[in-house]
């Protein structure tokens, strides 16, 4: 691919975002247990990075070693840069864990007891716990010609044990493997009277390493070390060749745990020859090995804040607000009839969305409900409401995206339950994931003495997931606007039926009109600038990668358009480059909540067009997904979106990171006045 304009590398951008997440763990303004949580989040993000992005890069290197990445670098060069940066990030994680977080936790009476410091009473308690709770479920595997190296599951905790001596059959023991079942707790609370601390804990790895000899009787344990293998987690389902996507996925899901190895994690003290054996057995190189100065899976430390009753070391809980127009009304339909409703999560509650669906399920005047589901969780009151509606005789149609990564099994289960109660379940369009967030309710109403059907719609930037609605920032719109409702109806027609593209009045839809409409809007701002008029673009999203949109932004900036981009994660556009992008700023907001809404603002000669969307500016969202962008037409609500979703974050000087012209980020520091957008919005809505 020839590159006309510069692009920053995607993989390095993802690692850069995780560096910003990890920086939260070093921020003294963040409560201590939340700082630990940010370390765990970084670890979880890295797991997914290796399972998906690094796995894909390694596949590309094998299949087409001479290819270039979209930024123009060779794949080998990208791989080398990614490995170097990932190694540094992992080292920084463990340094921060030991030098900053664990030290501070001990000062607060929260302590991890290492085996080297156990006294006699603690050792006896640990021994009893091992024999009572662990030994019955552990299966040691001795390695010999009859017991080859096991194919360990993706991201499972394992121990490699060096042994000396002969077993009961006279075999010379060399090495064994112990796999820790996922059901075993990774953190075990030590009784306070033994610990000496209000909250004392022992890691599962400490217990296993101390007593692993009990699994190999009469043999000498020379070493015992943790290891963990990360595997390629992409599912290989050829949608063109299968007749039933759900059945095909159910057959493919178990293989995810046994994909090609991508990364080996070992404890820092693992002997070199043991590491070599693990790499050889996994088919990995030295560069694919990451040394952990602590637990190899930091994600499991996420349990600690829930196990410790110390509210002073956590974020102050917030109670999302209920908008007055909703709180003061019995019927959600009456509320929407009086005007559009805008919800700003997590500052405002997700409950009105659920209440709308619950009322629709029970309302005898409701005849049909249509809903998209991408992620909703394993215990979803929203799905219960849909099933209740189907039982009550409503025409319920649910577009369930079975290929939502890492939620496939959950969505398959929901699809089965929905079908069992009589709902129509479809899986979208082959080759295009349904990522749009839409709910459509059709209801009989009386107008002028006549009965007619009226549509009500909810559109959102985030998932129909009550739990993440308390953790992610998103906007949702409830409306009975005739044109928007008709557009949503047409999109559902395309998802459930077969036919030509239907013309939409208000919505921009991928894979048809979203990309060209966006390009058209950017070009219109450029024309305003060339004519000497005010021109402005402000856009907020999770990721910006699509090359043609980036090229349009560069050209608009050169025409004089002032462009402010708020991109939480990876951004391939390079701001502040002389002669190219001096008029563009890029900032990333990393704070208590995960920034998730997508907002597109165009000054448009003073008309101020504002769109909300489920779509990031990426190839997949424009061309390989079903997405919608919807306008905010109500003037009051438009001012809210601009103020709460854009201006507040442009003024943030506590959680904002500004991208420099070389692609690196620098944290914005408060001057005389400190401004934190998320905390300000919490104060506004939740005080």
From Swiss-Prot:
EC number(s) stated in the UniProt entry for this protein: 2.7.4.1
Ligand binding (ATP): 45, 472, 568, 596
Gene Ontology CC terms, in alphabetical order: polyphosphate kinase complex
Requisite cofactors: Mg(2+)
Coiled-coil stretches: none
Record-linked InterPro entries: PP_kinase (IPR003414), PP_kinase_C_1 (IPR041108), PP_kinase_middle (IPR024953), PP_kinase_middle_dom_sf (IPR036830), PPK_C_dom2 (IPR025200), PPK_N_dom (IPR025198), PPK_N_dom_sf (IPR036832)
Active-site positions on this chain: 435 (phosphohistidine intermediate)
PTM annotation: An intermediate of this reaction is the autophosphorylated ppk in which a phosphate is covalently linked to a histidine residue through a N-P bond.
GO BP: polyphosphate biosynthetic process
Catalysed reaction equations from the record: [phosphate](n) + ATP = [phosphate](n+1) + ADP
Residues reported to bind Mg(2+): 375, 405
Pfam families found in the cross-reference section: PP_kinase, PP_kinase_C, PP_kinase_C_1, PP_kinase_N
Keywords attached to this entry: ATP-binding, Kinase, Magnesium, Metal-binding, Nucleotide-binding, Phosphoprotein, Transferase
Gene Ontology molecular function: any one: ATP binding
Primary role: Catalyzes the reversible transfer of the terminal phosphate of ATP to form a long-chain polyphosphate (polyP).
Assigned protein family: Belongs to the polyphosphate kinase 1 (PPK1) family.
HAMAP family named among the record's database cross-references: Polyphosphate_kinase
Name the UniProt record assigns to this protein: Polyphosphate kinase
């Amino acid at each position: 691919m020839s590159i006309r304009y510069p692009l920053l590398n995607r993989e390095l951008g993802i690692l850069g975002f995780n560096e910003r997440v990890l920086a939260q763990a070093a921020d003294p303004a963040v409560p201590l247990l939340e700082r630990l949580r940010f370390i765990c989040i970084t670890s979880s993000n890295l797991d997914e990075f290796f399972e998906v992005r690094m796995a894909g890069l390694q596949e590309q290197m094998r299949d087409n070693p001479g290819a270039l990445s979209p930024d123009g670098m060779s794949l080998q060069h990208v791989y080398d840069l990614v490995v170097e940066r990932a190694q540094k990030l992992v080292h920084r994680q463990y340094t921060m864990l030991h030098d900053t977080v664990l030290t501070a936790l001990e000062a607060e009476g929260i302590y991890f007891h290492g085996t080297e410091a156990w006294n006699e009473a603690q050792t006896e308690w640990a021994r009893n716990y091992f024999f009572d709770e662990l030994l019955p479920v552990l299966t040691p595997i001795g390695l010999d010609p009859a017991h080859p190296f096991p194919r360990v599951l993706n991201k499972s905790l394992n121990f490699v044990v060096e042994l000396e001596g002969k077993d009961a059959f006279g075999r010379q023991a060399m090495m064994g493997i112990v796999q820790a079942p996922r059901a075993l707790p990774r953190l075990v609370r030590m009784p306070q009277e033994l610990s000496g601390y209000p909250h004392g804990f022992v890691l599962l790895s400490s217990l296993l390493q101390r007593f692993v000899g009990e699994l190999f009787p009469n043999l000498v344990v020379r070493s015992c070390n943790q290891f963990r293998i990360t595997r390629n987690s992409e599912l290989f389902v050829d949608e063109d060749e299968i007749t039933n996507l759900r059945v095909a996925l159910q057959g493919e899901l178990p293989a995810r745990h046994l994909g090609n190895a991508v990364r080996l994690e070992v404890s820092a003290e693992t002997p070199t020859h043991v590491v070599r054996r693990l790499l050889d057995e996994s088919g990995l190189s030295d560069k694919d090995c990451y040394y952990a100065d602590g637990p190899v899976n930091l994600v499991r430390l996420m349990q600690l804040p829930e196990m410790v009753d110390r509210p002073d070391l956590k974020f102050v809980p917030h109670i999302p607000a209920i908008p007055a127009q909703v709180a003061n009304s019995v019927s959600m339909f009456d509320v929407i009839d009086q005007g559009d409703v805008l919800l700003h999560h997590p500052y405002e509650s997700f409950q009105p969305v659920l209440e709308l669906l619950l009322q629709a399920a029970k309302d005898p005047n409701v005849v049909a409900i249509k809903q998209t589901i991408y992620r909703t969780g394993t215990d979803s009151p929203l799905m219960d409401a849909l099933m209740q509606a189907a039982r009550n005789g409503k025409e319920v149609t649910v577009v369930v995206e079975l290929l939502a990564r890492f939620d496939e099994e959950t969505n398959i289960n929901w699809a089965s339950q929905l079908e069992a109660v009589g709902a129509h379940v479809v899986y979208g369009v082959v080759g295009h994931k349904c990522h749009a967030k839409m709910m459509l309710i059709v209801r009989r109403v009386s107008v002028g003495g006549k009965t007619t059907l009226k549509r009500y719609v909810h559109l959102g930037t985030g998932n129909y997931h009550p739990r993440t609605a308390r953790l992610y920032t998103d906007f949702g719109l409830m409306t009975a606007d005739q044109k928007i409702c008709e557009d949503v109806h047409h999109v559902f027609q395309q998802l459930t039926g077969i036919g030509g593209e239907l013309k939409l009045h208000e919505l921009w839809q991928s894979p048809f009109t979203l990309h060209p409409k966006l390009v058209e809007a950017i070009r219109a701002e450029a024309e305003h600038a060339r004519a000497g008029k005010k021109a402005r673009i402000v856009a907020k999203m999770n990721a910006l990668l699509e090359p043609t949109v980036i090229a349009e932004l560069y050209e608009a900036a050169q025409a004089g358009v002032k462009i402010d981009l708020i991109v939480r994660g990876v951004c391939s556009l390079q701001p502040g480059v002389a002669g190219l992008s001096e008029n563009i700023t890029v900032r990333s907001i990393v704070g208590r909540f995960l920034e998730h809404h997508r907002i597109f603002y165009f000054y448009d000669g003073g008309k101020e067009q504002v769109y909300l969307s489920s779509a990031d500016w990426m190839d997949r969202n424009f061309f390989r997904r079903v997405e919608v962008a919807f306008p905010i037409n109500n003037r009051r609500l438009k001012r809210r979106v601009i103020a709460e979703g854009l201006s507040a974050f442009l003024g943030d000087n506590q959680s904002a990171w500004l991208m420099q012209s070389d692609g690196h980020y620098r944290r914005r520091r408060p001057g005389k006045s400190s401004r934190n957008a998320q905390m300000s919005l919490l104060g506004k809505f939740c005080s």
